[in-house]
C-alpha cells in the first residue's frame, strides 16, 4: 500500500477549517448570550405581587407536559369569597364544539390532518389558608368547555389574606397549528397554565374561549419555571433561562419572570437561534429557518428601539420571537411574540412591529381584551404605523393607511369597533373594525392633538404600567392631557354602526 505523498497535505488545513466552520454553525443554532438581571424598576413593580411557581417536564413523544404548579394568591378585594376560580383554557381543545380553531376561517389551516384533541388533565388540587395545612379540594368545572375551574374553600377568603394553591396536572397538546398545539415539530404552549379568573363587580369573569381575538384577561404576577426537557430541544419563553444544567440525557432550564400577565413557551428540535443586545435587552429569535430568524431579529430590534424612544423603556431583560406554524399572523405574550413563519418581507416586518408593540399595549399596560379589544389591538397597530413612518418615511405610512385602514371607514358591518368579542362573526370583520377602524380613531385623535398622540401614549404607559386600564381610564387621561373632551369622537368611531 502506497503512503500518501506531500501533495495530500493541503487537505489538512481544509479539513480543519471545515471542522471549525461546522462547529461554529452548530454553535450558532443554539442561544449563547445571556439576559441581564432584572432592573430595580422591574423588581419594584414586582414587589408584593402574587407568586406562581411552575415545575414542568416536557414529554415530546406524548405531546405533553407534566406540571406541578404552586400559587401564593393574596385577596385585594373587599368581598369575602368562598370559592377560587381558575381559567383552564387548554380544555377548550377537547372537542369540535368548544375548540377555538373550528371557526371556518381557521379550521383547514389549524387542523391540516383533521381534528386533534388537547386538554388539561387535572390530577389534584390542594389549598392552604395562610400558614395552615394544605387540604385537598374537590374541584368542579362550571362550563361546558371545562375552562372555568371552581375550587370551594373551607373558610372564607378575606381581603389581605393569602391562599397557597397547589395543582398537579398534565397538559396534552393537540396536533394543531395554534398558540396551543404541535405542528411541524414546533410545540407551542400558550395560555396553558391555570390562572386566577379576574374578579370584578363582585363576581369572577367566566368569558368563553372565543375563536376571535384574545379572550385572556389577567393581572401581573411573578412567575418562575423549572423545565425539564430532552437534549436537543430549545425553548423560547416569556423570559430567558437564568440557568441551564445537564441532568443525564435531559436539560433543566430555570426561568424567572417578574411582573408579567402570563407565561408561555415554544419548544423545538428544529430551532435555529439568533440573538443580539438592543440596549439593555437581549433580543432572541428562534425559527427553523436561520435566514428568516435573522430578518425577524432585525425588525424586532428596530421596533424595540423605536418604541423605547416613543413610549418609554421596555422593562423586561429579554424579548423573544419565534417562527411558528400559525393560522394567523401572530400571537402576543409577555416577553414573547409568536409569528407565522410563512410571513416574509413587508408582511413580516409589519407583523413584528405590531406584536412587539403589544409589549407596551397588553404586557405593560393591561386592558380588557374581551370587551375593549381595540384598547390593545388598535394601539399596537397605531404604534406599528409610527414605526413604519420612522423606518420607511411619511409616504410609506400614508400608503399603509390608505390601503389598509381607510377602507374600514367605508364598509358596512353588523358590529362596531368597541364591541365585545362575542359580537364579531368573522376574523375579517374583527380585523376591519378593531384593528383598522380602531387605528383610524387614534389617527383622527392624533390629528386633533397636533401630532402628539405618541406623547400621550407615553404618559398613558407611565400612569398605567403593570395595571389594568379601562376605556374610561384612557379617555379621562386623554382629557387631562389635552384639556379636551374626546368622548364624542370615541363614540363615533367605536360605538356607531356605519349604515349604507
Regions found by a protein language model. Name each.
Residues 158-167:
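Short Pro-Gly-centered flexible turn/kink motifs
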Residues 7-66:
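N-terminal, polar/Ser/Thr-rich
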Residues 81-132, 228, 232:
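Solvent-exposed beta-hairpin/edge-strand motifs
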Residues 214-353:
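Hydrophobic helix-coil surface modules that form long, contiguous segments used
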Residues 63-76:
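Short beta-strand elements of extracellular/lumenal beta-sandwich folds
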Residues 294, 338-403:
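Zinc-dependent metallopeptidase catalytic helix centered on the HExxH motif
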Residues 70, 108-123, 140-141, 147, ...:
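Extended, low-hydrophobicity, Ser/Thr/Pro/Gly-biased non-transmembrane segments
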Residues 395, 431-500:
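Amphipathic alpha-helical substructures
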